[in-house]
C-alpha cells in the first residue's frame, strides 16, 4: 500500500514545522511547495536528513511547481504574508486573497480529491475564498483555527488550575480573531465544568475572564514577542491533528472553521464550530445550545466574518457567484 501524499503549500515557519511533524508521526510522503526558489528544497532536504536519526521513512520533495502536488491526499495551505506587530489578521486581506486565488487554481488542477486545511489569515475569509477558487466540496475544505484557539485556552486553564493539559477541555466558537467566543460552561477539568470550579473556590471569575481575553489575544501576544513573525509550532500541531483525523478516519470532535449552511442561524459562511472529522472530511457539525449572552457574542463574531467575506467579494467579484 502506497504511503499517503501530503502537500504543504507554503514553506515558511509553519510549513517547515508541518513537514517535520508529518515525518515524525509517519503520516506519509511530503511535498513542500513555495514560490521562493530554494526554500522548499532546502527545508525538505534538511528534514529528510533527520529521518535516519528519528527513525522514519518518508520522501520529502521541495518544489516551485504546483504539478508536484498532483494526487495529494491532504493539502495544508500556509502560503501568504504573516502578521507583524501592530497588525490585525484582517490587515492581510488584500494580499493573501490574491495568494488564495493562485493556490485554489493549483489545487483544483492537481489535487481535486484532497482534504484541504487552510491556515492563512484572515482565516475565516481565506478558507471561504479558497473553497470558491478551488471548487472542492465544502466538506473537504476547512480552516484551522478552533483547534489552536482551544489549545491556547486549555493551556491557560491548565496553568491556572495547576493540572495536566490532558485533563482540560476547552471550547472556542466563532471567527479566528478578536471576536472569537471561548465558552466557559462547555469547558471542563476532568469533566467538571469551569463555572463549578469557580464555585468550588479553585479560581475566581475575574481570573477566568482574564484567561478568556488572553485566549482572544493569543496570536497577537506571540507576534508581539517574536517581532518578526507569528506563531508556528502550535498552529502546525493543530493542523496535523486535523489531517490525522481525516487520514485515519478517527471521527475526532474538533472545532474548526467549517462551512455552515443553516446551523447556528448562519448560511453559506465559514466560521468556527465543533465538527466531526473523519474519512469523509467534515462529516458533521455539532450544534450546541447557546444562552443569550453567548448567542450575541457568536453573532458579533459571525458579523465580523461576513464583513471580511464581503470585502473579499469587492476585491475579487468572481467570489460573489
From Swiss-Prot:
Which portions of this protein are annotated as coiled-coil regions?
A: none
Where does this protein hold NAD(+)? Answer: 10-15, 34, 96, 119-121
**Keyword hit for Oxidoreductase:** yes
Which Pfam family would be a valid example here?
A: Ldh_1_C
Q: Does the keyword NAD apply?
A: yes
What keywords are assigned to this protein?
NAD, Oxidoreductase, Tricarboxylic acid cycle
Query: EC no.?
Result: 1.1.1.37
What is the catalytic activity of this protein?
Answer: (S)-malate + NAD(+) = oxaloacetate + NADH + H(+)
Q: Which GO terms describe its biological process?
A: lactate metabolic process; tricarboxylic acid cycle
Which residues are involved in binding substrate? 83, 89, 121, 152
Which superkingdom is the protein from? Bacteria
Q: Top-level EC class, please?
A: oxidoreductase
Q: What's this chain's function?
A: Catalyzes the reversible oxidation of malate to oxaloacetate.
User: What protein name applies here?
Assistant: Malate dehydrogenase
| Origin species | Chelativorans sp. (strain BNC1)
| Native organism taxonomy | Bacteria, Pseudomonadati, Pseudomonadota, Alphaproteobacteria, Hyphomicrobiales
Q: Which gene is annotated as encoding this protein in its UniProt record?
A: mdh
Amino acid at each position: 500500500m502506497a504511503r499517503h501524499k501530503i502537500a504543504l503549500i507554503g514553506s515558511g515557519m509553519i510549513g517547515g514545522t508541518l513537514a517535520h511533524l508529518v515525518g515524525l508521526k509517519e503520516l506519509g510522503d511530503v511535498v513542500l511547495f513555495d514560490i521562493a526558489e530554494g526554500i522548499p528544497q532546502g527545508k525538505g532536504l534538511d528534514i529528510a536528513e533527520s529521518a535516519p536519526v528519528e527513525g522514519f521513512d518518508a520522501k520529502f520533495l521541495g518544489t516551485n511547481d504546483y504539478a508536484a502536488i498532483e494526487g495529494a491526499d491532504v493539502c495544508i495551505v500556509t502560503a501568504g504574508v504573516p502578521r507583524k506587530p501592530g497588525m490585525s489578521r484582517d490587515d492581510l486581506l488584500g494580499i493573501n486573497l490574491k495568494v488564495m486565488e493562485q493556490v485554489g487554481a493549483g489545487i483544483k488542477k492537481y489535487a481535486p480529491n484532497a482534504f484541504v486545511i487552510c491556515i492563512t489569515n484572515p482565516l475565516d475569509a481565506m478558507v471561504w475564498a479558497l473553497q470558491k477558487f478551488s471548487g472542492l466540496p465544502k466538506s473537504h475544505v476547512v480552516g484551522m483555527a478552533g483547534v489552536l484557539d482551544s489549545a491556547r485556552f486549555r493551556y491557560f486553564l491548565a496553568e491556572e488550575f495547576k493540572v495536566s493539559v490532558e485533563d482540560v477541555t476547552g471550547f472556542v466558537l466563532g471567527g479566528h480573531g478578536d471576536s472569537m467566543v471561548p465558552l466557559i460552561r462547555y469547558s471542563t477539568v476532568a469533566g467538571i465544568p469551569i463555572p463549578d470550579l469557580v464555585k468550588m473556590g479553585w479560581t475566581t471569575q475575574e481570573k477566568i475572564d482574564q484567561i478568556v481575553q488572553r485566549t482572544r489575544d493569543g496570536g497577537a501576544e506571540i507576534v508581539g514577542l517574536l517581532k518578526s513573525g507569528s506563531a508556528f509550532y502550535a498552529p502546525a500541531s493543530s493542523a496535523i491533528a486535523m489531517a490525522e483525523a481525516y487520514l485515519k478516519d478517527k471521527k475526532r470532535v474538533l472545532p474548526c472553521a467549517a462551512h455552515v449552511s443553516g446551523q447556528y442561524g448562519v448560511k453559506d459562511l465559514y466560521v468556527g464550530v465543533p465538527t466531526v472529522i473523519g474519512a469523509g472530511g467534515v462529516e458533521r457539525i455539532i450544534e450546541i445550545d447557546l444562552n443569550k449572552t453567548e448567542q450575541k457574542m457568536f453573532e458579533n463574531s459571525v458579523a465580523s466574518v461576513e464583513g471580511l467575506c464581503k470585502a473579499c467579494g469587492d476585491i475579487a467579484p468572481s467570489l460573489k457567484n
